[in-house]
């Protein structure tokens, strides 16, 4: 309540929806007209005492300047949640998108560059405790079978979607090139 998350004004509705779903308010920053990605120069001026996180949106297979964005996040002690739905397989300075911030979010909707046959997605984190919490929440809040310690969700990828992605994933690099 009262928390703000800075994100890009040019994205699918799901970006702002995810922010609102946790009770925060999306604060929109315009795009850089040269890249159509979040204008890094505008982020710092949008930060207020209520700002808790940045949510950059990597679009068109192009990554946001994560060096500059992460420096801003570090300066202001902000969390970073990367929206990688439109840039699976993209890299910034040799590092894959989704591996810079606290969380990376990916979509496998059929229209994405790594699309399944239906809906699906993944979240990544380099923080072991956070990754474990995400895994538990994805299976109804269960850290082990039939033990529910939190109110979770049914966010498991079904076998058919996984099979489609298993066939497509080795081809992703070639498709990107």
Locations of regions flagged by a protein language model:
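PLP-dependent aminotransferase-like
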Residues: 1-84, 91
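A generic hydrophobic-helix recognition signal that picks specific residues
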Residues: 51, 75-77, 95, 120, ...
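Hydrophobic/aromatic ligand-binding patch that stacks against planar heteroaromatic rings
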Residues: 17-19, 72, 96, 113, ...
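Short, hinge-like loop/turn segments at secondary-structure boundaries
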Residues: 44-46, 72, 96-100, 123
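Active-site region of PLP-dependent enzymes
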Residues: 87-93, 100-177
């Amino acid at each position: 309540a009262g928390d703000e998350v800075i994100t890009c004004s040019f994205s699918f509705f799901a970006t702002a929806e995810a922010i609102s779903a946790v009770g925060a308010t999306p604060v929109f920053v315009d795009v850089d007209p040269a890249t159509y990605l979040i204008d890094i120069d505008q982020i710092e001026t949008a930060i207020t005492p209520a700002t808790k996180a940045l949510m950059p949106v990597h679009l068109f297979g192009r990554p946001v300047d994560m060096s500059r964005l992460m420096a801003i996040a570090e300066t202001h002690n902000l969390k970073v949640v990367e929206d990688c739905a439109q840039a699976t397989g993209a890299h910034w300075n040799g590092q894959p998108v989704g591996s810079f911030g606290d969380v990376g979010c990916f979509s496998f909707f059929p229209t994405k560059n790594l699309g399944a046959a239906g809906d699906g997605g993944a979240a990544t984190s380099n923080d072991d405790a956070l990754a474990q919490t995400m895994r538990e929440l994805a299976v109804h809040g269960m850290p082990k079978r039939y033990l529910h310690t939190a109110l979770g969700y049914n966010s498991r990828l079904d076998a058919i979607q996984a099979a489609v992605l298993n066939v497509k994933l080795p081809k992703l690099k070639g498709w990107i090139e």
